[in-house]
Regions:
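PLP-dependent aminotransferase-like
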Residues: 70-158, 165
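A short alpha/beta connector and helix-capping loop motif
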Residues: 111-120, 168-178, 360-361, 366-368
Length: 376
């Protein structure tokens, strides 16, 4: 039976096998593992790509958010407004600094709605933190204006947003800081965990650079409390290679998304991600291709029988319904758009191993499912 996996991690290795193996030998032969030149070069190259002043490699995306919030002084008694359509890590990072995550509903793009965010502002609010999900930016012009008007920090969880733009600005560069994840499933992933923080604030960058290394400054003197959250030099070396090929990867992901759009766009049973044409402020990079589907669970089972891997994000449960976390349910009002979305959401395969024939097979299988369903 034909197999089209949702993830294809071996495919990433096989694509660059010779180069990855050479990088491993080079870094190991130099014994260059922690805070070495490969990390410094990666930070410089990524900053150049994003047109941002500072990039700091850290242990993972959750650490990146935690360090950024901590550096801004957000803590006990404070509130941070986020979208409920996000990974639990976003809320966890806020809890880790002692603050409270406050959920505001999503808009038609299933990203943080500026109007909903405005309705959740209180005297305790310190920041607005949109998640740039699936490779698409939220309405950053409106969110930035909302933050400025209310004297709030604007910070970004851009774990899934590397390369996405709103207007001429990249995800992760709109506010005080933005964060990235290099988890293997991300747009450029490493062989394990990794993350980064982006900022244009010199003082904030200096503080976070010390905080990621036990509070030590550039000469090794401990100047503040910190933690161990350094992106390994070996991972940075791998990521430098991935970054070199990132533009071609984005082009291919957009081609796959366009093929899905053309093949599935006439199915009334499905809702597809918005397309970003030249008139749109969005430039999407499609980390995931998340749609909505009638008879979602039956469709997913049918595709599985066809050898097609799919995924329901966060296990089909938005963060505000994670009962064991005790966020304070009285603050989880007016999230109906999110709840409706999670009843129908489904992610189709979107990885760099997909061929056009693979995509067409997915399209044909979905079309076949609805054709059979409509005849019953």
């Amino acid at each position: 039976m034909r197999k089209i996996p949702f993830f294809d991690y071996p495919g990433i290795y096989n694509r660059f096998k010779g180069e990855f193996d050479q990088i491993f030998q080079d870094v190991c032969s130099r014994g260059a593992f922690i805070l070495q030149k490969d990390l410094e070069k990666f930070e410089i190259e990524l900053a150049h790509f994003l047109n941002v002043k500072h990039v700091l490699g850290v242990a993972d995306g959750t650490n990146a958010m935690y360090l950024g919030l901590q550096a801004l002084g957000i803590g006990v008694g404070d509130e941070v407004i986020i979208s409920p359509h996000t990974y639990v890590a976003t809320a966890n990072a806020i809890q880790m600094v002692g603050a409270s995550p406050i959920f505001a509903d999503v808009d038609q793009n299933y990203l943080l709605c500026p109007t909903a965010a405005a309705s959740k502002i209180t005297k305790h609010t310190k920041a607005i933190m949109p998640t740039q999900l699936n490779g698409r930016c939220a309405d950053m012009v409106s969110l930035r204006a909302l933050a400025e008007d209310n004297k709030l920090f604007l910070v970004e969880d851009s774990a899934q947003g590397l390369g996405a733009r709103y207007g001429n600005e990249f995800a992760g560069t709109f506010g005080s800081f933005g964060t990235l994840s290099f988890y293997p499933a991300k747009l450029i992933g490493c062989f394990g965990d990794g993350g980064a923080i982006m900022t244009n604030d010199d003082g904030l960058a200096k503080k976070m650079r010390a905080m990621r290394d036990h509070g030590r400054d550039e000469v090794g003197k401990v100047t503040m409390w910190g933690m161990n959250s350094r992106l390994d030099n070996l991972q940075a070396a791998f990521l430098r290679l991935r970054l070199k090929h990132f533009d071609e990867d984005i082009d291919r992901r957009r081609e796959i998304a366009d093929r899905y759009q053309r093949g599935l766009g006439n199915l009334s049973e499905m809702g597809l991600p918005p397309s970003s044409d030249d008139s749109s402020p969005h430039f999407d990079v499609f980390q995931n291709y998340e749609c909505t589907a009638d008879h979602r669970d039956q469709l997913r089972s049918y595709l599985q029988d066809k050898g097609i891997g799919t995924l329901i994000q966060w296990g089909g449960v938005p963060v505000h319904h994670f009962d064991g976390l005790g966020y304070g349910k009285e603050k989880f009002t007016d999230l109906s758009n999110t709840d409706r979305f999670f009843e129908r959401c489904l992610m189709l395969p979107m990885n760099m191993s997909l061929t056009n024939d693979d995509v067409d097979y997915v399209i044909e299988s979905i079309t076949d499912f609805y054709s059979k369903s409509n005849k019953q």
